[in-house]
Amino acid sequence: LGQAGARDVLLANQPVGPNVGRLLGLAGWFREVRFSTIADDAGAVGALAEAAQAAGITLPVWLDLDVGMGRTGIAPGQAAITLHKLIDQLPGVESAGLHLYDGHLHDSDPAQRLAKWQSMMDEVRSFRASLEAACLPVPGVVGGGTPTFPFHAQHTDHECSPGTTLLWDFGYRDK
């Protein structure tokens, strides 16, 4: 993506082990590109901060929220506020905002899917307000998946993650 001229690249999987170094290697090689990633636990944030500081880079990190998928992310609440504060305070990383993956919202009825999405986004907005009330920066919100892309695309208060429209996951034809 860096070679292709992308200016903003989000690695939407939490890097661990040697992948931390690989990400920072790309960020160092393509200094004109804003590389960022997600994190959902203090160990990962610490590893990212330590490696970024050693590389002389400040890496934007999105707090990965579990909004119902149950696969990645930290549930909105006090533990997530504490983790966001850690991202904000450690040298080497900075808060990029909130990341959410809503792949569990794939009802075949668009009205049902929209209602569930709106409820989920209300929770995200409430959590964001909690962070801001604690004087923690929330520069942005990024989220989405293939089935909810049309909903995210209609809102300018956050960025869309387009899902798998190029690869088209099995079964999405019916959703």
Regions found by a protein language model. Name each.
Residues 2-110:
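Active-site-proximal beta-alpha core segment in soluble small-molecule metabolic enzymes
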